[in-house]
Design a protein with these regions (language model features):
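Walker A/P-loop NTP-binding motif
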Residues: 19-30, 43-58, 74, 79-83
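Conserved pre-motif I regulatory segment
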Residues: 1-35
Length: 441
């Protein structure tokens, strides 16, 4: 399907960078490197042209996308599915059985595989993935992949791809002079789509606020700030896992709607945390820097630096979570006595002033329902939407994101209607099958 038709159907307006990248991939015949700031939409920049170029009638694997983490693999597969172009995608990553993935790969026969380096090599070693028909090999977040030490694994995987396959690297940093970008990872001779100089445009769309804390322990100042931000979607960044848990526990005790995210959680816990934040069931995400890369969550209004970022790169990727796709956003530095703004924050700042009467913590706009039937039960998004409207008594505007998995589904509903809808659907059937419906805990 033509990329322009896909965007028109979905109501998407491609940015200048995305158009330039798409043109280089569709019209060119060589390798392409896309350099563009965090939050500028690089995932769509390569998926839209691939959706046009891939032969959806074939059952061959035609593209392999290497990503640095499981969250980006999952999200990228979801983005491809949302394009509704008939192109099948599948995410392969650690944290689950490779044997289960092999069964799914054989059944689905994806056109595109999104994979972390280690899991990709595992499947290649076991011949679970046949790369012979691959026409495109993509490395998304190329800079982060190198920084995380995946160079050897990526080189090994790339060596096993057909020599005729075109290569597409996407990065928020120019890694041409990085010694790790060698061998199969060298971008020498690539057509460069460089929009890094436009990063100042993103800075102009982010307002920087200084929040002074009278205490070294900033928890009370943070709580007061979040109360002022109301139900706006906000990410609070800290540098340590223990600090995330401590902060989350305190804010929950204060009545805030939040979820916590860090590398110490297992895969299902991390996925649930991001899901609740993305669908509006939690206003606040408390996160380590793990949440500053690989997460594409629209409409994040505020970034709060509870701990100062340790490097300029950390700062860039934190702030890149807001003001995405030409939107505006705000970032807040909470500074205790003796702390100063890092030198690399060179924009104009404002001092945040608290009102005399602080508002109470805002409730979340949405709540997530767990529905105990899924794809294996022949239940679709449309079935769930109809069930919640006809049986649950909800209006369409009171229902948010719906996601259907193999054996269950999630649906976001207006928080004010939670008890109403649960009462209406208890004991009722969906597509003739009695099912459990309850609030996600």
């Amino acid at each position: 399907m033509d990329a322009d038709k896909i965007t028109e159907k979905l109501g998407i307006t491609m940015s200048q960078m995305q158009r330039a990248a798409a043109a280089a991939i569709i019209q060119g015949s060589g390798n392409v490197e896309v350099l563009s700031p965090t939050g500028s939409g690089k995932t769509l920049a390569y998926l839209l042209p691939l959706a046009q170029l891939i032969d959806a009638k074939s059952d061959e694997l035609q593209a392999v996308v290497i990503v640095p983490g499981r969250e980006l693999a999952i999200q990228s597969a979801e983005v491809l599915a949302s394009l509704k172009a008939g192109v099948r995608g599948y995410a392969c990553h650690g944290g689950r059985s490779a044997m289960d993935e092999h069964r799914e790969l054989r059944k689905l026969m994806p056109h595109v595989v999104f994979a972390t380096p280690g899991r990709l090599n595992d499947h290649l070693d076991k011949a679970n993935i046949d790369p012979s028909g691959v026409r495109w090999t993509v490395i998304d977040e190329f800079d982060k992949c190198l920084q995380m030490g995946f160079a050897d694994e990526m080189n090994h995987a790339m060596e096993r791809m057909p020599k005729t396959a075109r290569r597409i690297f996407l990065s928020a940093t120019n890694m041409a002079d990085d010694g790790r970008a060698n061998g199969e990872l060298s971008p020498v001779g690539f057509h460069i789509v460089d929009f890094l100089e436009n990063s100042d445009d993103h800075k102009d769309r982010v307002k920087i606020n200084i929040v002074n804390s009278p205490d070294k322990d900033k928890l009370r100042t943070l709580a007061n700030l979040l109360a002022c931000l109301g139900d706006e979607s906000t990410i609070v960044f800290l540098n340590y896992r223990d600090s995330v848990e401590r902060t989350a526990d305190f804010l929950r005790s204060e009545g805030f709607s939040l979820t916590a995210y860090h590398g110490g959680l297992d895969q299902s816990q991390r996925e649930e945390a991001i899901y609740r934040f993305a669908n509006g069931s939690a206003n606040i995400l408390i996160s380590t820097n793990l949440g500053s890369r690989g997460l594409d969550i629209p409409n994040v209004r505020n970034i709060v630096h509870y701990h100062l970022p340790e490097t300029e790169e950390d700062y860039t990727h934190r702030v890149g979570r807001t003001a995405r796709w030409d939107k505006t956003g705000k970032t807040y530095f909470i500074l205790s006595e003796g702390e100063t703004l890092p030198d690399y924050v060179d924009a104009t700042t404002c001092d945040f002033e608290f009102p005399e009467n602080l508002p109470k913590p805002a409730k979340s706009r949405m709540t997530t329902l767990y529905i105990g039937k899924g794809k294996k039960d022949k239940v679709s998004k449309g079935d769930i939407l109809g069930f919640l409207c006809k049986t649950g008594g909800l209006k369409g505007a009171e229902i948010g994101r719906i996601d259907v998995y193999d054996y269950y589904a999630y649906a976001a509903v207006d928080n004010r209607k939670l008890n109403f809808v649960l009462k209406n659907v208890q004991g009722c059937k969906i597509k003739g099958k009695r099912t459990k419906v309850e609030e996600m805990r």
